Amino acid sequence: MWGFFVLKVTKQLFVYFFMIKKLLGLLTWIVAFNTSALELKTIDEIHSAYKNNTITAQQLAQGYIKRINQLNPQFNAVINIEPTAITQAKKIDELSAQGLWAGPLHGIPVLLKDNIETTGSLPTTAGSLALKNNITNNDAFVVKQLRNAGAIILGKTNLSEWANFRSSYSSSGWSAVGGQTHNAYDTTRNPCGSSSGSAVAIALNFAPVALGTETDGSITCPASVNGVYAIKPSMGQVSRSGVVPLSSSQDSVGPMAHSLKDARLVLSVLQGRDPLDTSTHSFELQAQYKVTKSSLVIGALPSDKFTVETQRLYKKQLSALKQAGHTVVNIDISDDLATLFVDEYYVLLYDFNKEINQYLANTSDQVKVKSLSALIDFNKQNKAAEMLHFGQDILIQANAVDLTQTDKYQKTKHRYRTLATAAITNLYKNNNVDVVIAPTTSPAWKTDLVNGDNFKGSSSSLSAIAGTTHITLPAGQVSGLPVGLSIIANKNQPQAAYTHAQIIDEAFISTIKKPE
């Protein structure tokens, strides 16, 4: 009897011990989840946690996925989670267990705008139901670069449908596939676009890194109004192959992150020559860089096109730069830009007609829409889902462009690019400044699905047209809403822009309240 009692107690103690062990394991996972999803943000922080064995890549990926599942329904930032994300993370953990390092992005989860192709079961939709079955089974060049550097592809983000090139009255961040993306700081306000979900995802810490694409403002504007760092790279620096096109004259792929250092590191991974994108060239850009000049001559562009509150914040930013020992010079564009935006619109219409027809014609048999005219018809036939809030006047205009007028196109393209490049070059040369800055945009406006977007000021177009680097930094708030500061690089001088952006960012850390 006593032996039976001892045996029973021993078994019970063993059960309790096993339960406590499981609870401790669960507690460890919860701590790891909290650390990964709520505290770890930068690449350095994550890599430090890996090296200290405080978290695994699998735990990190699971933490982000759990966070996305919990918060994404309020924001519509993420369209799909990559089904192989945990498998990718396990492979990273296997390497770590062997003391191996996959690359500079070892175990770093990355979200991709849903116009960037990936292998596997996820479609690349550009936000359109016409591409809901567009499973390409192809990694875009930038995705190959990410994988080779050790990154984990975590999923696809929402976007303005067709990169905001469908309607003059569209609401940025809306797509038929993903619905309306909401600003990370106020769900009644707009996230800007077209890389809406990527910016909101970083602001909400759904991942440490996300990729966006830009034709004119589609990386920098969402980053600005959601308080994150972003880089629109120079033309030819990063390949666009495997990305649903808008305009090869201006399209760029660039990173968003929690720090300028991280954005810079990711860009160093993405860049490089790609035979499938003839604009690309070998780009010598080091991930780590040395700041050699501490006192800058900063050219400040006017802020009168932005909201009054943004103008006040800009004055504070300029004051902070002066307090940090820099010289601030008020400058303005002296070049006549009267034809610039009309020319830009024509080039974009021409490019989109030509390039989206080529893209659609080469999709798999699962995609039934094979041309721009077929896309327009598809939207009409699916009006209840596709044209619930706004139409497709831009698609119709693009479809009407005469692609045989190549001389007109080439002359227009030469004129507008020469004009934009000269305007930037003259800002530097005529004012003898080290760097040119401006507000990126005003704070996020109220989302209006009836009337569309309500922009107040933008600094993206010159860089977008000239093909030069454009960096945006979180630089304070207006009524609790983030506002970014733009660094507009001179032609062929991205390295200087990164260096100067770092100096400016450091000046703001102690003097300008940053979004949290």
Model regions and ranges:
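Short helix-loop capping/hinge segments that flank enzyme active sites or metal/cofactor-binding pockets
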Residues: 106-126, 295-299, 350-418, 472-482
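Flexible glycine/proline-enriched surface loops and loop-helix/loop-strand junctions
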Residues: 126-128, 182-187, 194, 243-252, ...
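Gly/Ser-rich catalytic/binding loops embedded in alpha/beta enzyme cores
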Residues: 38-216, 234, 295, 319, ...
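Glycine-rich, small-residue loops and helix-cap segments
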Residues: 53, 107, 396-516
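Sec-dependent signal peptide recognition
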Residues: 20-26
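A short helix-breaking turn/cap at a secondary-structure junction
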Residues: 232-317, 324, 508-516
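N-terminal signal peptide c-region/cleavage motif recognized by signal peptidases
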Residues: 32-34
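Acidic-enriched catalytic cores of C-N bond-cleaving enzymes acting on peptides and small amides
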Residues: 260-282, 305-338, 349-381
